Amino acid sequence: MILTAGEGTRLAPLTDDWPKTLFPVGDRPVIAYLFDLLKQYGIKEIVLNLHHLGDLIRENLGDGSRYSVRISYSPEEELLGTGGGVRQASRFWGEEDILVINGDNLLELNIERLILYHQASSAAVTMALKPMGAHSDYTPIYLDQDSNVVAIEGKKRSTPGYAFIGAQVITPAFLKQLPRAGPACLIKDGYRKLLRSRKDPGQIKGFITTGYWREISTFQRYRDANRDFLGGRSPFYFYRWREEFTRRGLHVGKDCRIGPRTNFRAPVYLGDGCEVGAGTTLGSMLLVGARSSIGEACGLQDVIIWPDSKIRKGSHLKEVIVTPFGKIKTG
């Protein structure tokens, strides 16, 4: 299951018009990378919960055939939170354990090892965790010597903590401990409640991974994910243009029209069908989505341009996200 019902309030006003899981990173929506990850491990039956802009998600993803997956939808009349959303959708998998991933995640994760690790324990939940950096602002999670989660706290201890990367395996027995109706949070109403009960220290296991992870819950994190893509630090930049981009720091998609005296400052990515007016300077750190139009005599630096967007003649933009609905200053 991929959690896609949230409102994404920290990314407003972008999320007023477009659901977070469909935000482009590089040349694809975030959720497309999650589909790819799941398919690597033979997982093609996927449930999405829907609430905020759910019709747009359904309209853009359909039955999933474009991504070689099969999507089922669990619409929520009221926003049920992470726990309530999984609880309601559990009719799709019955008494089986379920892998649940946040829909705003970009991650490298060995799902096979995660599942085997979970199955080898008697845990109700197994959380995928990554060692925290010294200046991380994520809520620290602490483990004992047996990799049991012992604390999910808002303050750091002297011992190293871990960040939860938004992927977990959950048992049906755990879901039955959540409130039976209404909104519920997996962490607040589930994991922390289990920890407070102190019945069994092995009820929540931590699976440690060191692979790539970004989530796009804020403007800064969304920009960082796209900078990783442009800078070659992301494992998701390996599609059809990897060799060319690695060599030149420049990708020009199919059917692009580039005006005379255009100046490129790498790294620059132009999606298919883009149009660039004469005398424009592109870059550095510029990502232009497919079918976008940039007028003459523009200067663009550290800009993310969504597909089907338009930049007026003579525009000079820096640290901005441009969408078909408008532009947002992020720096």
Please name every model-derived segment:
Residues 2, 24, 28-102, 108-113, ...:
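Conserved N-terminal catalytic core of the sugar/cofactor nucleotidyltransferase
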Residues 7, 104-105, 262:
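Active-site metal-binding loops of divalent metal-dependent hydrolases
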Residues 43, 97-99, 106, 112-119, ...:
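Catalytic-core segments of class I nucleotidyltransferases/pyrophosphorylases
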Residues 121-131:
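A short, conserved acidic/glycine-rich loop-to-beta-strand motif
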Residues 244-331:
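Structural signal for interior beta-strand "rungs" in well-ordered beta-sheet cores
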